[in-house]
Structure formats: structure tokens, C-alpha cells
Amino acid sequence: MSSKGFEIGEEIKEQNFFIDNRLDASQLFFVIYLLGEKLHTISLSEERPSIRYEGSLFGVIGGTLFINGTTVTTGYSKVGELEVLVVSPQTAETMFFLINKEDYFVLGSDTIASIQTQGNAQVVIHEDTFIIDDNEEFVYFNNAPIKGHHYVKGVQIGDQILTHDFLLEKRKEQWKLTTFSETVVFNQESFLRQLPAVEFPKDFPKYRRSPRLRLEPPSDKFKIQKIGEAQKPSKNGILRAIVPPLGMLAATGVTSVLSGRNPIMMLGMGSMSVITATFTVSQYISEKKEHKIEDQKRKEDYEQYLIKAVAEISDKYDEETEVLHFRNPSPEKLAEMIETYNSRIYERMASDKDFLVVTLGTGNQASNLSVDSDINDRDNDEKSLRVKHLVEHFSTQREVPITLNLSTQTLGLVGTYPVLKTAVANLLLQVAFFHSYRDVNFLSLVPEKSYRKDWIQWRLLPHFKIQELNMRGIVHNAHTRDLLLNSFYQILNKRKQVLKDAGKEKPKFVPHYIFTIFDDSYLSGHGINEFLAEDMSELGVTVIWCKEDQKLLTETVTALVEYKNQSAGEIINDNKIYVAKSFEPYGDVPLLEKSLRKLTNLEHVEVEKNAIPESLSLLDQYEVKKVEELDIQERWASAEPNKSIKSLIGWRGKSEYMYWDLHERVHGPHALVGGTTGSGKSEFLTTYLIGLAINFSPEDIGMLIIDWKGGGIANTLDKLPHFMGSITNLDGAGTARALASIKAEMDKRMKEFAKFGVNNINGYMSLYKSRLNPKPDTKYPEKPIPHLILVSDEFAELKSNVPEFLDELTSVARIGRSLGVHLILATQKPSGVVNDQIEANSTSKIALKMASEQDSNELLKTHDAAHITQPGRGYIKVGENEVYELFQSGYAGVPYDPDDTTVETVDERIYQINGIGQTELVYDPGEEVVQGHDTSDLPTQLEAVISEVNRVFEASNLTLPAKPWLPNLESKIPTPEVTQTAELNTKIPLGLLDIPSKQTQENYTFDITDSSHTAIFSSPGYGKSTVLQTIVMNLARQNTPEQIQFNLIDFGNNGLLPLKELPHVADIVMLEEVEKLQKMMERISSILFYRKSLFKKVGVASLSQYEAKTKEKLPIIITILDSYDGLGQQDRRKEDIDNLLIQLLREGAALGLYLIMTVGRVGAVRMSMMSNIKTKMVLYLNDESEVVAVMGRERVTQEEIVGRGQVMLDIPTAIQFYLPTHDGNDVKLLEAIENDVIKMDKAWTGKRPKKIPMTPEELSLEIFEEYSEVMQWQREQKIPMGMSYQTTEILGIVPSAQPYFLFAPMDDDQMLLFQALLLKQIAKIKTGVLLVDFNESFEEVLAHHSLTENVTLITDKNDAKDVIAGMVGYVKLAKKHENGEPMLLVISNLQDFIQKTNLPASDFVLALKNVYKAGLDVLIFAPHEYIAKSFDEVPKAIRQLKFTGMIGSRAYDTPLIKGTSSSREPELSIQDAYFVLRGGSSFDKMKLPELTKGENND
């Protein structure tokens, strides 16, 4: 339960259950004590109705307690192995009381008991002692069970005794008893019942400073008067009084004697003289007595005066003594005050004059009283000496605290370590008591060997927690030295820079550091020494040096204190002035660690200044819980932007709203906002802008964000209907775009105002809002133009990086007033950034926390903003201080939880504090305990308000204004959907144009028939191949292969390869494919020639004319050439290719043939080519001059973005080229292209363009025989032997088509291949074969190939006559024009055959010329050297025949081929040969199938 019950008795009556102060008894169901070897307590409440503990489940359902499923009532129970005591708040009661220690206070069942219970256990309290008897019942003392009789234990604060009937606790000042049933009887005479005593400050451990009692020592002036002088008697007065009468008597007597006169007469005269003398003596005696009485009275009066004066002085003197001791209590006294959490804790603040004033001990010092007297040095009588003694006594205060001010000094302490350790401990204790850890932090360098003995007890004191570093400020080894001193050095550097920037007015640094150095070895070689060599007080640091000898101290010491021993010390210097003031140092504080620990408990909560909250949420700012309560719809309806455009930016006091109104007649029209990093500048601007959205509809207010850094505010507000765009990434291209957009908006507004005859935005919007109730002959606008709030976050970056953009903003500030454009320029450092024009037009300024006083002065003309410490707090200044207010702005990023009913719960996680004072989690019970429910998935208040604004807008009939700033072009834009049409459609979407001067972004339509030949210039890696893909794919999607066809030539990195399977693509060729490229060029050339001839024949000049005249459709053929400059200048093919391309550029467009090519360098294209390229597009080029060469000086500033380029419309215009698919994902782009290609390939069943005929690189016999043409040949009893390189047609032996078929290999290996291949192929036909191999040339091949049934092998030369006879028979049939049985005669070696048969050359030639006509085909094998170059009659003769054959030699090297060829032709591979017809007059290079090793070894 909370400490509320400690305050007033009424609350005790309402809630009188105090078992656990942490729990609210009203929410509590049961408290369960588990009675085992150790007592455990479980509390079940509304917040936590069930818990599992050590395998047992405790829970409350419907007010009933269940333990492991068993119902349990209050009191003692046993559930299985568990013994429990269940307590219910409904039947329990807690009371507090006092007892007489000398009496026996009994709790038990005896009738004499002070508190009579039903149980047998008995507890007796007497003289601070417990006497406990369990009497066979359970009793727990401090959670441990007690068994037996007369268990005696001394009473300690915190002791607890649990029995069946009660829980007894000893508190600090009272006894606390909780009884568990209503049967307990109280003997009220045995104790004094009380309200619970307050043991801790209110809201403990939170602590707030109390109003300080500021006592000043009296300074009265006193002057002690000396005693008045006594009246002195006349000197010889008695003689002067009696001598004359006596003299007269003597003279009379002498005269009488001498003259002889009458003696009687003389007697009379003598008597008179005697009488006169007698009276005179009597009078003298009387006066002397009176003088004595008066002198006595004088002395008595003076004594009374002295008593009164001394009493008066003593009162003031004692008052002064008390004040001195009050102001600076001894450390021991402070420990007593800490024990009771005295209200004087943390009473001193940095602004107090006694800030960091400490006392070193007690001694004598001059009194503040002025006591003087008028006694001079010559007055030495007793009274005077006494007065002098009094004056001397009251002029000195004795045994009073001797103080020293540490705030502006460097202190040097001299003495032994034990003495100095005590002295420093006492100093730090005083500082820690009187000064908050928010104002003062400690950093001490102590010896490693004495850390655990002397300093470890200080480790938890919050003053030793360096707030800026989150580390403990005790350096006691090398590890802590490295961590702390390096970080502290950085703090000092920052402060030094702030001090340097501050100028004349010195800043006050918080916290102030007390830097105590016992062991300076840690400083060796450290950069911090440069600061220690100077006065550090200006940096908010007091250094205390502790040395055994004065000689070891540094020269920076301004206060020097010497401790001679534990009981004698002397202040030698104070503020560099010799004072020689002795004192008696304070001794060690008893139980210092206890005092430190108690002081550590406090969490200092500072009092709110000016009632401005330290933090404020967005909805708190409006004092609502739900966004619906904002009444946004009503606010929009009642808004009058022509009079005010105010927004609530925060509070200037408790519920005192602070509005900012940029209307030109209030705080506007423009403003400056300043705030350093962490000041909450972006959050403030967000709060201001969302406030505008709350108060005004999108028709009234729009906002445009300029953010040099990108993101930021724009990302948080882009969902608002008021949001009109963001200008980010202001590099070269972005700047030009932004300038054009802003200028276009200003121009648009001026034109619109002029159009409707108004001169400002108020007049325009008044007309707009009046359109629903029109007046005759009045024009009304149909579109709203809102006030535009133009926010530039960090415009200092703009000035340094994009000065021309800031110039445009300056122009906006100058002319935007009447146009409804309001400029807010925000920056971290306004110094040197704000020019005169901006300053003159920025009526209001907002300054949040500024980095320096100079920056604050730049905005506010005061230093106030430099001293702000809280994010979101700032000053608003309008004009010349017409408004000057401090405010706290609302923060919109807090979770939106309108149903929040926060319940404080106990965080059960356990942390350990490591060696440097940081916390580390060591135990987590399973889930993080948070205050209230989990808010991690909740939207922020900003998001909730934006959603509400959108809801209100969507429910309204308001018109969304046109946006002046369109979003930056996306870097990846999928191509729009295109569909195929029956008619040819050459117009395709190619990219998105960005035209800021017209405030529009629109599709760029590319029409090949209009754009004609096109060149795309781009450096490598910027998407030129992707543009080609987009062109090809979109044209292919819209048209069939009968309408558009493509020739793909890729001189780059296979960018066109994904398109090769399109049904529209004739073929694709790479630069390295020499032969295929040559064929592609020939194909293009032949098409040009064919169409020119065709058009000439029809009598037309262009494709459109041809189609109109003949009604015949010809496909448009587009040659796509990627990376033209990949064809190097040294390439021998370049000249031919360029010539063909020039011809295509000149003649192709009219014939329906177009070229689209990409080029990496403008200079790579010949002028003759460039002049014939109608359309030029540019992507990013590394050389800016090339962009100028293509686009001119008005080029668009380049952006280094893939796919970003420019095209020439009326002027160069930026474009983002579309991706070739509808999926904008890079990873899936290639896959998407392939899928689309496959779909189109499968969908098209019509006629396709012919591929470039090419033999495969690998042509195995299996692949060869799978060709349909090969299979057709075999069905027709032809013998396929290979494939034409030029046409890929099948070449081989066609029966009855030639006098003979010649095999002329270059070497034995090729001979074996020819032989093996022939055997393989003749095995596939049914025609009979006669293999004549007299010299066994086929022996090696036949060893691996078995002959089929249709082959007869003749090796015996005796069979030669039969062979010749057979040939003669066929000759005869030929002459009769008859056909014999089809037969193949294979002569394995011509030279050997002639030798063995002795057949004359003429007869052999005659046979060859005729036998093939009758059905006998002769196949002759002869080495090339023999058949081609021998002068024997037979080879010489048969060379003249129109034979067909396979020649293994280069064309240049053989006379068997009649035609021109190059000597640079490479040697033929074993798989290559020339296929010759008509005796060599026609020839074609062919590729032979490759026989695998297995096939050769069949």
C-alpha cells in the first residue's frame, strides 16, 4: 500500500490493512504465508489474481482462493504437502502503538495479556527483549521458524513475528500489529494507540527541496561607554577654608599685643574667627560625605549600564554563534540530519552565495558584530580594563565553523593520508548534503590499495554518478582511469569551447565538478593535465589536491590548507591571500556508510519553474484524452484564415496556451526557428504543423517541407491531406527542380489572383468560399489555394551547399506575404546564416535550446535560450519583444492510449551495479514489467491525430488543392500495363516525365515511327540496357511478330539476352560471335535490298505507301544495338558494320527498318551517323560536356540514379525510364521478364522471324541425328554427313546426284572420322553398300564398328574383277537409260584401288560418268595431297569431273575448290571440312558431327 495512510486518520479508517505498503489493500484478494523451513509470502490482487510458485498454482476465482485446484479458506490450512496461513484484508486489521519498555507487554491467550489471542503462542516484550514461546504452534521470527520455550532475542528495528493470530513488527518509532481475526481482544490500558508515524518524506524516495530558511548573522554595531569621572574635592580646600579665620585670629592677637588694645575686644574677634573656622570644617566634612555617596551611585549606575550593554551584545553574539553553526553544521550533525531526512537536504542551489561553501573544522574568527568603546590606551583603571576585555571578547567568535568557498578556487590540502582522508570525506559529505547531485558531481582519484577500505562506501552516492557519462566517478585502478578520465577530458573540451564561444558573459556550467586528486599517478601522460595546469573554476570544476608536502602542490592552488595532525589545521591562503587561520579539524563521522546509504535513497525532483511542465504530450497540450475530443470538424468549420492561422505550440504555464500565428497581421508572415541537436526542433515543427492541420482544413492550409537531410518532418506528416510535398536531396538536379517548382507556384498564384481580380490570398479564398452562393456577374474560382507553410529544416546547410536555393527562398520571403506563402527557416546555428532580407521579413523567432549564447543572441538578442536544458522548451519572440514568452511544446511521439488507466506495478527485475556504476540485468521473471499495459503496438498520438484528420477530410466535401510540389521521381517505376491490339501500335509508355515548371509529371510516349532512329547515351551501369528492354517488351506486348520484329545485337554485357526467346525476335548476336554477327549484318543488308527492290517494283517510296497500295502488311523491323561503342576502333569489322548502319540510318526509316542503339560515349558515334539519328536520349554520363553536346546548355542537371535521364521535348526534360515489367523489384526483375517472355512465346502460334542460321558449338552425333532434316534425309535413303556453317542446311551424299562423292581428308585422324561417320550413317539406310578395302584402310575403324547387313566388305584383290564387272554392268544400264538396283560403292583408297584393279584412267572416268545414272553411287576416299595434287592419270582425270565431296583442307590451300579465299583463314579443325559441288565450283564450309569415344569404340 502507498504512504497515503500515513497522513490523516480518516484514511486509516477507510483502508486499515498495512501488511505490504507496496500494495493497495483495496485491490488485494489474499495474502498467503507458506509455512516451511523459511517463510514465503504470496499476494494475490486484481492486478495479479494468480501465480505459480515452486510448482504450485495459487489463484482467485469469483472471490474464492484455490491452491492447486483445492478451495482454501482464511486461516491455517494444509493442502497436500503445503502448509499455509491465508489472510484476507476484509478480516484483518493493522494498528500502531507505543508500550512502556519497563512493563511486560504480552501477546497471547492468557487473560492478563495486553493483546489476547485465541492461539497458544505467546510473545512477551520487556526492556527491548523478545521472549517467545511457540506452545506447539507455528511462530516465525524474521521468516525463520521458532521451536521451543523461552526463545530470547533482542529487539531490533524491522523485526517481525508471525503467529496464527497476528503479524507483529518493530518500526523505528512504533510497534505495528496486524491481527488476522476479529476475536483478538485489546487491553487499551497496556499501550498507547497512535496514527502511523511518518518514517520517510512524502513521496519517498522522491525528494523535493523545501523552502530554505536563510539566516544571516547579525551585524549590529555597539559602543561601550567608559564610566563617568568621579567629582574630585578641591585640593587643600580645608586649609583654604580655615587658614583665613585662623590667620585673622593670629593677626588680631599680635595686633592686640603690639598695640595694647582691649583684650576683650580681641577675644570677640578671635571667637568669630574660631566660629568661622569651625563652620568651614563642618561644611567640608559634610561635602566630602556627599561626594562619596555620589561616587558610589556613579559606580553602581555604570555597573547596570555594563550589564545591560553586555546582555544586549551577548544576545547578538550568541545569535551569531547559532547562525554560524546553523549555516554550517558539523559532519556529525549532518549525519544526524540525514538519519531523519531533514528538510535542509539539497537546500543550496548554484545561484546561492554559499554555494559550495564548506567548513573545515572549528576555530576562532572575527565576529560580524561591531563592538567598540571610547576608552583610550591611557585608561588603565579597573573599569577601563574590564571594558577593553569585553570588547576583545565580543570581537571574536570562538569554536565556530571555519569556512572555505570552493566554487571559484583550486584547493590544496597538505597532510598525511589518514588525516586528509577524513578531511576530504567531511568536505564531500557537506557538499553532498547541501547540494543536489543535479548541481554537483564528484570525481575522485584515490589510491587503489585504499579504495576498499576508505572509498568503496561512497560508490552509490548519486553525486559520484557522472550524469553526462552514466559512470561512477571514482578512479581507483587503470581500468577506471581509462574509462573516466578520457570521457571527462571530452566534457572539459566541450565546456572550453562553449566558454570560448560565450564571449564576455561567462556561462554557468551545470553540474559543477569536485575533482579530488589523492593519487596523481593516474594523470601521468594524460591530456587532462593541460586543463589542470590552468584555473578550472571557469569550466565549473573545483580541483582538490591532496599532498603530504606543500612543495608537491601545483601553482594553480588558490586556497592552501595544512593539516598538522588530527586536531590542528591551518588555512594558509584563501583566494591567494595569506590568512593564517587556525582551526580544529572535524573527526571521523560515526557510521558514515549508513549516512551515505540513506542519502543515496533520495531521488531529487526539481520544482517546476514558472509552472511550465517539464514535458507535454500533444493531446495533453489540448487537454483531451481522445482525438475525437479535438472536434476537428468544428474547428475547420469555424476557422477564419483571413484573420488568423494560429496553431497551439505548447503551454507557457499550467493550462496557459501558447499560440503561434503566422498571419501577417499577428506574428507573421515569416519566421526563424533555432535549436541545437537534441533540442526537439523537428518535434516542435511537427507539433506546430499538426496544430495547423487540427485547426484548418486542407483548403485553408497546406504545408511543403524542405529538408536538406531528407526524411525527418516530411516522413511524419506525409499522410496528412494538408501535406503538399517535400523537397529533399537538394543536390544539383534537386535544386534546379525545387527552384522551378517554387517559382511555378508563385507564378501560378499571381496569375490566379489576377484572373479573379484580387490582390492577395484572403480575397481569393473569400471568393472561393462564396462560390456556393454566387452573385450575378461575378467569377468564382473552382479550386482552392491554401496558405502555404514552407518549412526549411536546416537552412544553414542550404546556404553553404545550395546558395542559389536560399536566394529563391529570400525572394519568397519578400513577395510571398500577399501570395499566402509563409516561410519558416529552421537551423541549428543561426550565426552568420540569416541575411538582412530574411531577418527583415521574419517577424517572429522561436529559439529552443541553443548551443551557445552567441547563437541565442543571434535570434533573441538575449542569452536565455543557451540556458535551456529540456527538449521542446523554447522562447517565442515577436518583433521588438511585443511577445516574449517561455513555453514547453507538446511532443506528438508518445503512444496513443485513450483508455489508459495506469496501474503502478512492482518491477521485479533484479539488476546489479557494476564497477563503474552502470546497471546490468541479472534476473528477469519472464517478461518486462511496465507501468500499465504494453503500449509497444499502439500508434503514436501523431499517427492517431493524422488518422482523425483524414477521417474528417474523407467525410467532408472539401476539395484537395493542387500540389505545388510533386514527389521526386521514384528510382524504380514499373511500366504501365499495355495490351495487344489488332492493328499495329508503335506508341508505348517509356518513362515518367518530371516537368516542375508546369507542376506536373506525365507519361512519356515513345513512337518508333515518329521518333525514328534513336540513340541512348549512358555511362556504364545507369540502365541503358534496361531502357532497351522496356522498349522491346512494350512493343512486343502491343504487337504480334507479324507486325514488329527485332534483331538484337549485344556488344555489351548480355543485357538483351533475356529477350531472345520472344517470338518477335529474329535472333540475338554478341560481339564475340564473329560468324553470327556477319550473318546478322548480311541479313539486315539483304532485307534493305529486298525492300528497296520491292518498293521500286511497286512504285512506292515508303512502307506506308506500299501497304496502302498493295494492301499487304510488312513487319516493322527494329535493330536493337546495345553498347555500340563496344565495337572498338581497331576491330576489323567496324568499317563494314558502320557502313551498313549508316545505310540503315539513311534508308531504313522509309522501308520500315529502324535502329535503336545505346552508346557509352557521344564521341564514339560518327558524325555521319549522328546526323541521321532523329531522337537522342541521355542517361547519366560521367562527362558533363557530352550531355551539353547532346542536349545543349539548357540541359537538365544530371542525377546519378539508374534509369534517370533526359529527353528533348521543347526543352530538355527529366525522365525516369520505366522498368520493363510491372514488378519494380530488382531481385525479381529478370525473373519477371523471363516469365513475360515465356507467356508471349507460348501464346504465339503464328509465323515467326527466321533465326540466323548457326551451327551449334557442340554437335554430337546424337544431337545431329535429332534434327528433323537429318531424319528426313535418312528416310529418303540419303546419307547426312554434316551441317552448313552458312545456312545450317544438312549436307551429305545424295544418291544419283553426282559422278562420284569424294572424301579428301587432310590427315589420318580426319580420315578415321570420315570413315567412322560414313559407317554410322550407311547403317541407317537400306541401300546395299559394297566396301572395297584392298589395303585395309578401314581396318582400324572396323575394329570398333560392326558392319550392318546391307554392307559387303571386299578385301581380297582377287575380287577386283567382280567389282569392275559390276561397274561395267551399271555402265551398260546407263547407256540404255535403265536403272539397276541402288547400290553404293565405297572405294577405301583410290590409289590402291587403281593399282589393284589396273583400271585405265579413261575407263574409270567413263564408269564414273555413267554408273550414277543407273543407280550405282561411287564414294571415293583419297588423301587430300594425292587427289588434289597428284599428276597420276586417274586423279588428274577425275578432278575434271563435276564431283561432290568433303575436303579437309583450307579453301586457299586446295585446287579442288575454285574460288577466292583468304590466306589468313585459320587451319580447319578435325570437325570442319569444305563441302564442294560441281567439281569445286561451289563450296560451303560444313561442320561434322562429333563422335564420342564410346561411339568410336563401338
Swiss-Prot record:
It comes from the Bacteria. PANTHER family: SPORULATION PROTEIN RELATED (PTHR22683), TYPE VII SECRETION SYSTEM PROTEIN ESSC (PTHR22683:SF1). InterPro entries: Firmicutes_EssC_C, FtsK/SpoIIIE/SftA, FtsK_dom, P-loop_NTPase. Keywords: ATP-binding, Nucleotide-binding, Repeat. One of its GO terms (molecular function) is ATP binding. SUPFAM superfamilies: P-loop containing nucleoside triphosphate hydrolases. ATP binds at G675, T676, T677, G678, S679, G680, K681, S682. Pfam families: FtsK_SpoIIIE. This is Ftsk domain-containing protein CA_C3709. Residues 655-857, 1001-1188 form the FtsK domain.
